[in-house]
């Protein structure tokens, strides 16, 4: 089929095979002879005309992106042929088209009185956040643009700070909802929220305090049933906790452990502790506490294997009996939850410290954010596979989140203060880069929080549910964007 629209300047025509993986957007298979000067806009118009997505038909045109050999077409077809085929205009070009990912649109900002350390959008309509103010907060997205008031503010029983957070109870559970936060105090604090209704009279409380680590908690995740919690730590270990069906009546772990932080268990200190009465640790005394602890529980299993800190955890989205961990030792490891056995090992370069990990539900591929300013993809379906693709960034990546339905897009947060949305079919550059500091909603005069904490630019957390994207970090704010990503 030859395309020569009226009024267009004479141009050489190239044989193009247009195809898509979306049945609803498919056009008849044919070789289209298309002017070499055409770019994305003209190609998108052609697809919409064939599909009948025109104003005459009462339909709104759909914007499309076009990929050639796995990379987004960013110029004309002629420019691509000159660059990649040495000017060969006779061979057919296979061009895949996909619905465009629209630029994220900032909707709101919520100020937090300290650095934001963790974010979760796993429960629709709400964002769960943890901060170094030692708070866990629940924010309703519907009211975020008008008010920064949290629906619940849950204080940790320590002033050392919260490092991560997760929803524990499944979406279907509407009462006695469990949430969890990992802390610098080596513990994971699990809270029970009576209801997310603002009219609830009952107050939330800390139900469990999970012990067992010797370093700060770096990541906390929960199973889809809400019955199990897994934590990763700077001590290199991964702990599994099985929550009881009914509230217990006694503790599994004694109160007031001797030391909470790395470096406090030195030989000299242990000798002094033999001669002196045990004293409360600074930051964990009753006077500094902001709440009461829950039932103290020990781990049901400890998974060992990492030779450095555990950077992040993700529950396998295709196999509920498996979890994945990424570590500062450059490895990604798969673990069987029931036995605690290491079922898979992907060892990358030892200097490629992984700070976080997430997984695409569509194909099981893992994505890690790394200290060496890269995002790495790992194919979990091949036992001997290492890094299958690397995306370059400008600074370390402490948080990544894969799109829940698209197998190609993900979002990342970086230490340089930017949020990036990627399409792995075009891995050289991000589709969109958003700087929180340069946003119209940013307050240039806010240098410190009300409690005197100095603010910075590094982002520490990002999450994306396919419709809403949130990010936060040292700037003491949660940025909220509308972003579909399909």
Curated annotation (Swiss-Prot):
Repeat positions for WD: 212-251, 305-345, 349-388, 392-432, 454-486
Localization per Swiss-Prot or TrEMBL: Nucleus, Nucleolus; Nucleus, Nucleoplasm
Pfam families: NLE, WD40
SUPFAM superfamilies linked to this entry: WD40 repeat-like
InterPro entries linked: NLE (IPR012972), WD40/YVTN_repeat-like_dom_sf (IPR015943), WD40_repeat_CS (IPR019775), WD40_repeat_dom_sf (IPR036322), WD40_rpt (IPR001680), WDR12/Ytm1 (IPR028599)
UniProt entry tagged with the keyword rRNA processing: yes
One of the record's GO molecular function terms: ribonucleoprotein complex binding
The keyword rRNA processing is assigned to this record: yes
Role: Component of the NOP7 complex, which is required for maturation of the 25S and 5.8S ribosomal RNAs and formation of the 60S ribosome.
PANTHER family tied to this protein: RIBOSOME BIOGENESIS PROTEIN WDR12, WD40 REPEAT PROTEIN 12, 37
Annotated protein name in UniProt: Ribosome biogenesis protein YTM1
The organism of origin for this protein: Cryptococcus neoformans var. neoformans serotype D (strain JEC21 / ATCC MYA-565) (Filobasidiella neoformans)
Gene: YTM1
């Amino acid at each position: 089929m030859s395309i020569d629209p009226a009024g267009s300047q004479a141009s050489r025509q190239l044989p193009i095979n247009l195809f898509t993986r979306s049945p609803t957007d498919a056009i008849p298979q044919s070789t289209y002879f298309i002017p070499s000067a055409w770019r994305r806009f003209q190609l998108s118009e052609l697809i919409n005309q064939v599909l009948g997505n025109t104003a005459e038909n009462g339909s709104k045109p759909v914007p499309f992106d076009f990929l050639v050999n796995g990379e987004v077409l960013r110029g004309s077809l002629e420019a691509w042929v000159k660059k990649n085929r040495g000017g060969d205009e006779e061979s057919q070009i296979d061009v895949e088209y996909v619905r465009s990912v629209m630029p994220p649109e900032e909707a709101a900002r919520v100020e937090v009185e300290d650095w934001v350390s963790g974010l979760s959008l796993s429960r629709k309509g709400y964002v769960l956040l943890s901060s170094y103010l030692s708070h866990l907060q629940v924010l309703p997205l519907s009211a975020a643009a008008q008010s920064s008031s949290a629906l619940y503010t849950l204080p940790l029983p320590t002033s050392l700070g919260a490092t991560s957070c997760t929803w524990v109870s499944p979406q279907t559970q509407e009462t006695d909802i469990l949430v969890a936060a990992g802390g610098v105090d080596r513990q994971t604090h699990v809270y029970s929220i009576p209801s997310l209704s603002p009219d609830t009279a009952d107050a939330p409380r800390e139900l469990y305090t999970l012990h067992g680590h010797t370093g700060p908690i770096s990541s906390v995740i929960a199973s889809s049933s809400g019955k199990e919690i897994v934590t990763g730590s700077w001590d290199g270990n991964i702990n599994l906790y099985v929550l009881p069906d009914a509230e217990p009546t006694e503790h599994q772990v004694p109160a007031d452990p001797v030391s909470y932080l790395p470096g406090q268990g030195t030989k000299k200190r242990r000798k002094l502790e033999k001669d002196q009465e045990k004293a409360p640790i600074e930051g964990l005394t009753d006077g500094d506490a902001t709440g009461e602890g829950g039932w103290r529980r020990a781990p049901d299993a400890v998974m060992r294997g990492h030779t450095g800190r555990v950077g992040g955890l993700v529950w396998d989205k295709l196999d509920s009996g498996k979890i994945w961990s990424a570590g500062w030792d450059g490895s990604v490891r798969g673990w069987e939850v029931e036995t605690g056995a290491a079922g898979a090992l992907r060892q990358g370069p030892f200097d490629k410290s992984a700070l976080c990990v997430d997984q695409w539900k569509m194909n099981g591929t893992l994505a890690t954010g790394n200290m060496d300013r890269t995002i790495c993809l790992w194919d979990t379906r091949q036992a001997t596979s290492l890094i299958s693709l690397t995306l370059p960034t400008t600074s370390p990546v402490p948080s990544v989140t894969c799109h829940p339905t698209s197998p190609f897009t993900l979002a990342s947060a970086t230490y340089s203060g930017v949020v990036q949305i990627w399409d792995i079919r075009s891995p050289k550059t991000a589709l969109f880069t958003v700087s929180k500091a340069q946003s119209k909603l940013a307050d240039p005069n806010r240098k410190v929080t009300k409690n005197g904490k100095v603010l910075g630019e590094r982002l520490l957390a990002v999450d994306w549910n396919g419709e809403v994207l949130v990010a936060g970090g040292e700037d003491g704010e949660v940025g909220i964007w509308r972003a579909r990503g399909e």
